[in-house]
Amino acid sequence: MKLSLVIPCYNEQDNVELFYNTATEVFKDKGFDYELIFVNDGSRDQTMDKLRHIYEIADENVKVVGFSRNFGKESAIYAGLKESRGEMVCLIDADMQQRPELVLDMMAILDKDPNYDAVACYQEDRRESKVLSAFKDCFYKIINKTSEIEFKSGASDFRLLRRCVVDAVLSMSEYHRFSKGIFSWVGFNTYYMPYIVEDRANGTSK
């Protein structure tokens, strides 16, 4: 079995090496192959230089995709999915707010129950203002009333997908992509796993 991690990066010069070192420690000697796919989304800092260094010192399990300018996280996710080769593919941020260790828990869920094709993480403890939380709750209530598909409140892009889900997502031709909507639209059974969003290791939220 092979696991692919797709890691969008925008101005993450202070975090990408920490992420790489942490992920390498988490996934070594676990009995499966894995690859790290870093997608530099037109960063204006030294993120690309740091990624080049990682690529030079790493084994062959590291890929780096670089955009000429900032196209946005949705485009970075799509590019990473296209590069992925794993039977399971995880979308995870580079800022360490989503801990790589949690991916093992997500994998265990899919290994245990073949009826699920994806694990999506949602924020159990929102470390944000009451106003922002209320706004988000209102957004999900409105969109669920007006949409044919249901969106889980607090769900993030942090998720693990079987290859069949990845292939279905890549087959869709939408130019302006909304990943959470697409993941719901393709219709595979999803397990929602609560998690606590950690503080950023370095820098500020994008």
Enumerate the language-model features and the residues they cover.
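Conserved donor nucleotide-binding strand/loop of the catalytic core
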Residues: 34-37, 48-83
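A conserved acidic beta->alpha catalytic loop
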Residues: 40-49, 96-97
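Acceptor/aglycone-binding surface of glycosyltransferases and processive sugar-polymer synthases
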Residues: 65-69, 73-83, 88, 100-182, ...
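Catalytic beta-strand/loop signature of glycosyltransferases that borders the donor
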Residues: 190-197
